[in-house]
């Protein structure tokens, strides 16, 4: 599971077996994890993050969206 980005307590990464799904990123901090679709940065799954923290994460992902999409394409080849 390659890590693409780290900031503060967060780690953004891919699961290598999820390349058949649309482009997305997982973010983990402690025991919390969420999955975000990269095309619109919507939340696909949230396991534990409070709403205000999800908003902060989305803002950070938005700033790095192009790099995240590039990393997805490099890793999965699509």
Model segments located where?
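Glycine-rich, flexible loop/turn motifs
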Residues: 1, 45, 72
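Short, charged/polar N-terminal "headpieces" of proteins
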Residues: 1-21
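Alpha-helical interaction segments
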Residues: 4, 26, 62-66
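A short, structured beta-strand/loop element
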Residues: 15-50
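C-terminal structural segments of small proteins and small subunits
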Residues: 50-78
């Amino acid at each position: 599971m390659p890590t693409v980005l780290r900031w503060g307590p967060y780690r953004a990464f891919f699961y290598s077996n999820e390349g058949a799904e649309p482009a997305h990123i997982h973010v983990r901090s402690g025991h919390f994890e969420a999955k975000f679709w990269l095309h619109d940065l919507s939340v696909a799954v949230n396991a534990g993050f409070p709403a205000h923290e999800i908003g902060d994460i989305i803002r950070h992902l938005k700033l790095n969206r192009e790099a995240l999409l590039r990393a997805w394409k490099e890793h999965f080849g699509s």
